[in-house]
A protein has these predicted regions:
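Helix N-cap/capping motif at the beta->alpha junctions
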Residues: 31-43, 64
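Active-site residues of response regulator receiver
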Residues: 55-56
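Short amphipathic alpha-helix used as the core "switch/output" element in two-component signaling
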Residues: 40, 65-78
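Two-component/phosphorelay signaling modules centered on CheY-like receiver
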Residues: 10-30
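A Lys-centered signature of the CheY-like receiver
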Residues: 108
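Alpha4 helix (beta4-alpha4-beta5 surface) of REC/receiver domains from two-component response regulators
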Residues: 14, 66, 89-104, 114-117
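Receiver (REC) domain active-site loop signature in two-component systems and cognate sites
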Residues: 59-62
């Protein structure tokens, strides 16, 4: 199983990666700090085709919404499940994510236990 985590916050990346590895020791997860880096990884590495992409909404250079639009234009990623996440739960952001083809939206939880429960549900579904 492969995934791509796109987040500009190194602390959030670390917690997310540790949680993913706790749930599935065999997961291969690459990281990108923004949408530009994510698209570069997804278009330049034909051997890396993630099953899951986790996109933070608010990032510099290219935010998660713009990145999602671009990813949806890449035919080789049609099977990929894309989860947007953010500390915001604004209806407009949730709606836009769904409209653009995100699989679901995760509101960043306050605790690692909630994150583990959420990610476990995603990966084991």
């Amino acid at each position: 199983m492969q995934c791509l985590l796109v987040d500009d916050d190194p602390d959030d990346q670390e917690v997310f990666l540790m949680t993913l590895e706790k749930i599935n020791k065999n997961i291969e997860c690459l990281t990108a700090n923004n949408g530009v880096e994510a698209l570069s990884l997804l278009t330049s590495q034909e051997t890396f085709i993630p099953d899951y992409i986790f996109l933070d909404v608010n990032m510099p250079k290219m935010n998660g919404i713009e990145c999602l639009k671009n990813i949806k234009g890449l035919a080789h990623l049609n099977h990929c499940k894309i989860f947007m996440y953010s500390t915001t739960s604004e209806a407009s952001v949730l709606e836009k994510s769904k409209k653009l083809g995100a699989t679901d939206f995760i509101v960043k939880p306050a605790s690692p236990a909630v994150l583990e429960e959420t990610l476990s549900g995603i990966l084991n579904n």
